[in-house]
Amino acid sequence: MCSIGEDDFGDDGAAHAMAVESLPLGIVLSPGNCSKCDVNSDELYKLNFRTAECRECFLAYARHKFRAALGAAKILPRNAEVLLVLDGSAESLVLLDMLHFAQTQNTFKRLHCNARVVYVEEQQVQGRDPVHLEALQNLSTQYAPFDFYVIELGALPSSMQRIKDYSPSLNANNELIHKLQKLRSLTARQDYLQQQRKNLICSVAQCLRCTHVFESNISVDLATQLLTAIALGRGGSAALDVALLDDRLSGDVKLLRPLKDLNEQEIQFYIHAQRLKPLFQKGSRYGREHGQTASLQNLTSAFVANLQQNYASTVSTVFRTGDKIAANSNPEQSSCVHCRSTLDTELSDTLLAIEYSRSVSEAGVSLYKSGQDLEDLAKKRLENKDGLCHACRAIQAELDSGNLL
């Protein structure tokens, strides 16, 4: 029987509306007794709205969230082939450490799955130096017997290599980089890059014959992603963007987010408790260096972060709202050939207005055309059988030349 109370793992609920305690929050407090096990400890961990606890009790609490996310929904079959996506962030290292711990328990507590790890090298796309190989090799040694692979974003799935055989590519003719340069706005570039990354991970999973993919998104990531999806015109698929299970990937590959219930403070405490060393910070992701107002994604992220500082319930409210949105699961509807989201085949007045405005803008000096002609052109665009959803069609419209696919 678990010795940790059930109340420790529930939704924070109304606790978010409480005034912040006067007790200082931090990793290291003065030595004392753990409020859970009553053992004297030199280092206590104090989370928001929780009493101070020792390292072992905190780790048990955090790891229980990981196991509970997978166990409650029973979505991971026994002995499933799992691909863990590593990007060097603190969140991905926490996921790696938790999965490794779950794999090294005794038979009764062990998470029965066969795991592999793939590191997606994104630094070349961002114009930065690649990660130090020594750091990756140290991770491979520390988390044996997991098999570690490396693939560069924008490369073919067949170019994937084991960590011991990998050397950074010096090829500057990355097709993905050239296509990103053709997109006019940072919003379109970030959206396109996210879809390309997801498609690459799916292809890697198929190459390794993995049926499930673990990603390290936490609650604040999913809250931001929900609002971003709506702003980009991906509201129809927003439910799957924040769900524990995303089954839109091709080849029956399922994407899981087992850290969805963890917050940023818990991640930072776990990093400290396990003495993990992230390879990159979250703020180093593509396009963040251009500022908060450079794209819809950056602006939404800053908006959520600023609200969270003043109103502690922001992330929880948005995140839990996303949990309540039902996904459209009609198997008869076609999917977008780029992002795999369900296509909306009904003629929407909103989309018609957007395409009408775009037609007027492109007409220029040809505005002598009647309004009916422009409306017919807008309808024709919406009925175009290009296989793209509204959001991906917007990316296509941003391309100076060429095709999205």
UniProtKB/Swiss-Prot annotation:
It is found in: Cytoplasm. Keywords: Cytoplasm, tRNA processing. GO terms for molecular function: nucleotidyltransferase activity; sulfurtransferase activity; tRNA binding. Pathway: tRNA modification; 5-methoxycarbonylmethyl-2-thiouridine-tRNA biosynthesis. It comes from the Eukaryota. One of its GO terms (biological process) is tRNA wobble position uridine thiolation. GO terms for cellular component: cytosol. Gene3D superfamilies: HUPs (3.40.50.620). It holds the Pfam family CTU2. Its main location: cytoplasm. SUPFAM superfamilies: Adenine nucleotide alpha hydrolases-like. Plays a central role in 2-thiolation of mcm(5)S(2)U at tRNA wobble positions of tRNA(Lys), tRNA(Glu) and tRNA(Gln). May act by forming a heterodimer with NCS6/CTU1 that ligates sulfur from thiocarboxylated URM1 onto the uridine of tRNAs at wobble position. Belongs to the CTU2/NCS2 family. PANTHER family: CYTOPLASMIC TRNA 2-THIOLATION PROTEIN 2 (PTHR20882:SF14). This is Cytoplasmic tRNA 2-thiolation protein 2. It comes from Drosophila simulans (Fruit fly).
